[in-house]
């Protein structure tokens, strides 16, 4: 999986592990990277809260998906958390779309939030649904 870092100071193993485990379809291990009350915010869906719920959601919704992160940079950093902005692509059996991930880590290096946004316009996405 190619991973190009824009911010050369950014080298966070947890972020890399998130994408690696996701691409291996090891969703329990992916969810284990989250804090106990971690949140996954998929596009167009309600928030998924907690490791078990995240693992179940990924098993149901993400099987067959592959993510290709290409750029990562630190966006916010303070004593209580750090955020990374990642851009790349998501490939499904039906299409490939540009995406971004906002990933927040706590001081224990656990993921507290992954917010995923698709960087395509809604009419393009609806066209896939109609085919």
Description of each model-found segment:
Residues 1-24, 28, 32, 131:
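Short, low-complexity N-terminal intrinsically disordered segments enriched in polar/charged residues
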Residues 36, 48, 86:
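Short glycine/serine/threonine-biased micro-segments
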Residues 2-3, 55, 59-131:
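A beta-strand edge to alpha-helix "cap/lid" segment located at domain peripheries
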Residues 36-37, 94:
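Short hydrophobic/aromatic segments of transmembrane alpha-helices and their interfaces
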């Amino acid at each position: 999986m190619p991973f190009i870092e824009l911010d050369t100071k950014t080298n966070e193993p947890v972020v890399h592990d998130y994408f690696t485990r996701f691409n291996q379809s090891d969703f329990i291990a992916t969810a284990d990277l989250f804090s106990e009350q971690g949140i996954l915010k998929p596009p167009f869906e309600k928030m998924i809260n907690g490791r078990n719920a995240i693992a179940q959601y990924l098993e149901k919704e993400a099987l067959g998906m592959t993510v290709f992160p290409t750029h990562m940079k630190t966006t916010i950093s303070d004593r209580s958390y750090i955020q990374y902005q990642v851009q790349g692509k998501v490939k499904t059996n039906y299409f490939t779309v540009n995406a971004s991930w906002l990933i927040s880590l706590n001081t224990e290096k656990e993921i507290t939030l992954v917010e995923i946004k698709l960087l395509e316009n809604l009419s393009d996405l609806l066209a896939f649904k109609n085919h």
